[in-house]
Amino acid sequence: QECKCHGVSGSCTLKTCWVTLPHFREVGYALKDKYEQAVMVEAVRGRRHVVPTFLKLKIPQNNSKPAETDLVYVDRSPNFCEKDNATGSIGTYGRFCNRTSTQADSCELLCCGRGYKTFQYTRTGQCHCKFHWCC
């Protein structure tokens, strides 16, 4: 919730408050935490029901049903490191990576623990520069 005061010289004779969403980064961190703690479930059908009546944990822990706040999944995610024609994933083998990056192009993420070779290269080309005499 955020509030703003209205009044002469900053006095708070009238206060307006409204509900706001959390910052985008906070939402991202919360979703990532949920993703890392997601649980695999399977659908359970009632005796005469075609539609599943509830979900239960695939690997039971203390209780057999996931909490309402749990992030759940039915199928495991494919391994995007390896080529998989069934899912259309081309894998990451042979991709260029950035050794110093911490983003999606980092060698740590793209190489999937296989290691990587480093090399340097020089690129020459037109810079389309212009010289302007100013003084």
Swiss-Prot record:
Alphabetic keyword roster: Developmental protein, Disulfide bond, Extracellular matrix, Glycoprotein, Lipoprotein, Secreted, Wnt signaling pathway
Highest taxon of the lineage: Eukaryota
One Pfam assignment: wnt
Signal sequence annotation: none
Gene name of the encoded protein: wnt7c
Post-translational modification: Palmitoleoylation is required for efficient binding to frizzled receptors. Depalmitoleoylation leads to Wnt signaling pathway inhibition.
Similarity section: Belongs to the Wnt family.
Lipidation (O-palmitoleoyl serine): S9
Primary location recorded for the protein, binned into one broad class: secreted
Glycosylation sites: N62, N85, N98
This protein's name: Protein Wnt-7c
Organism whose genome encodes this protein: Xenopus laevis
